[in-house]
């Protein structure tokens, strides 16, 4: 796991640790507005996104292309409150050799553990329900360590495969996370630990 300065920092790190120019994301319909803005910003870096019309495994599969490198959804959509079939979408993503990234902010780990349902990477905007007190901004990124990174499809992961289940986090910690200032401030980490009792 990696603690980040915000939920958006966690999502940015999660995506940019995988993506490069020419890559494609298949994303759920009805995502949080800040997420849609981020995915729109990535167009300037040659990264495109296709949004599914409905959050069904079949709808996700219909949008996958050879350039797709991430399938992304929220456990419970914000603001539509639509629920993603995490297990079904994970099976589709893995069938195509693609990691499944899930934003579990609304459900929190108290209600849903997406890793147990097949997700590969999970992020939380812990500023919201994990903190519970509205006194700190923070985000969490968790890698389940089970995704098999194909060095041909994900060339950026090649030198980190030696770390086995920690390959994704090793790449993140030795690259973007260290150089882009996304780390969580100590005071916010402290406030989150106090707020956890309200979860």
What are these regions (language model features)?
Residues 2-199:
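Conserved PLP-enzyme active-site core in the AAT-like
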């Amino acid at each position: 796991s990696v603690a980040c300065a915000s939920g958006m920092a966690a999502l940015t790190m999660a995506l940019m640790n995988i993506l490069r120019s020419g890559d494609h994301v298949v994303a759920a319909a009805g995502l949080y507005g800040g997420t849609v803005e981020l995915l729109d910003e990535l167009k300037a870096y040659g990264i495109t996104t296709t949004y599914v019309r409905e959050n069904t495994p079949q709808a996700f599969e219909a949008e996958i292309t050879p350039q797709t490198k991430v399938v992304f959804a929220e456990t419970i959509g914000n603001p539509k409150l639509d629920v993603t079939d995490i297990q079904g979408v994970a099976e589709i993503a893995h069938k195509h050799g693609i990691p499944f990234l899930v934003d579990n902010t609304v459900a929190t780990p108290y209600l849903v553990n997406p890793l147990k349902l097949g997700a590969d990477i999970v992020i939380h905007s812990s500023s919201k329900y994990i903190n519970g007190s509205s006194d700190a901004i923070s985000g969490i990124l968790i890698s389940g360590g089970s995704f098999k990174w194909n060095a041909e499809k994900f060339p950026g992961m090649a030198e980190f495969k030696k770390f086995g289940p920690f390959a994704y986090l090793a790449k993140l910690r030795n690259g973007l996370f260290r150089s882009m200032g996304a780390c969580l401030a100590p005071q916010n980490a402290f406030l989150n630990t106090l707020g956890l009792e309200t979860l």
